[in-house]
Amino acid sequence: MNTDARLCAMREQWDPEADAFRCYFTGIALTEEPGDRRSITWEHLDPRDGSRVVLAAALINRMKADLTEEQFRGMVKALADHFEHPEEPFDETAWPPGPARPEPSPPA
């Protein structure tokens, strides 16, 4: 766990007017209610890099799964485009390559 990265994210995402943290991806105010889709969770922008963490709504965290931030944004955009124009084929270039889970790093 990278404590400095977490403290930095907390400072950057705190909204004193809302008295709440804001979701990195959506900007919505996060809750501390267990089971709420807006509940606060930690999200790794890159699953292989523990130094790049943000606070995200539980629902968004589940949607992102093991994708990098770039892969997630590309997939969401491709889905939105396909929802808007269902007659058009899905942009398969947005589909993330490789295995569904990142390979564990070899021991140092």
Residues of each region from the PLM?
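Polybasic, low-complexity binding patches
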Residues: 46-54, 62-104
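Histidine-centered nuclease catalytic patch
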Residues: 22-58, 64
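Helix N-cap and loop-to-helix transition residues
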Residues: 3-6, 57, 68
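Short, charged surface segments at domain edges that flank catalytic/cofactor-binding sites
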Residues: 1-22
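A boundary/linker detector
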Residues: 1-4, 99-108
